[in-house]
């Protein structure tokens, strides 16, 4: 399935724990972002929730700039949508800076109202 990555459009956000959720309304998305980022100004791009839904996956805090999340695939499996994510972790010697980062991905895709399942190899 095709999707749009909205991560850069919402700016830097900080999710202090592993988070995964699907949003079918602007208010639900805004509430979750505000609850996880108190006091931080939020910027939401235009999203037509009549036609699209949004999925959030966040890794929680990481110790350097070498971590990142990547959407590997988004598949409609008939009775559900499956989002597969890969977390990039730094190797010894990678040019990274030691500081707390909060990798996340926020994607929009055609609305289906099917359950959305996260497949994140190596994570519960």
Predicted features by range, described:
Residues 1-124:
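Exposed, flexible binding/inhibitory loops of compact, secreted disulfide-stabilized domains
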């Amino acid at each position: 399935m095709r999707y749009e990555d909205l991560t850069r459009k919402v700016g830097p956000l900080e999710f202090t724990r592993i988070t995964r959720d699907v949003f079918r309304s602007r208010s639900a998305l805004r509430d979750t972002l505000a609850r996880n980022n108190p006091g931080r100004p939020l910027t939401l791009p235009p999203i037509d929730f009549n036609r699209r839904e949004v999925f959030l996956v966040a890794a929680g805090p990481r110790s350097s700039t070498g971590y990142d999340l990547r959407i590997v695939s988004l598949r409609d499996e008939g009775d559900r949508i499956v989002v597969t994510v890969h977390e990039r972790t730094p190797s010894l010697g990678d040019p990274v800076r030691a500081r707390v980062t909060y990798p996340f991905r926020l994607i929009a895709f055609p609305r289906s109202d099917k359950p959305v399942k996260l497949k994140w190899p190596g994570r519960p």
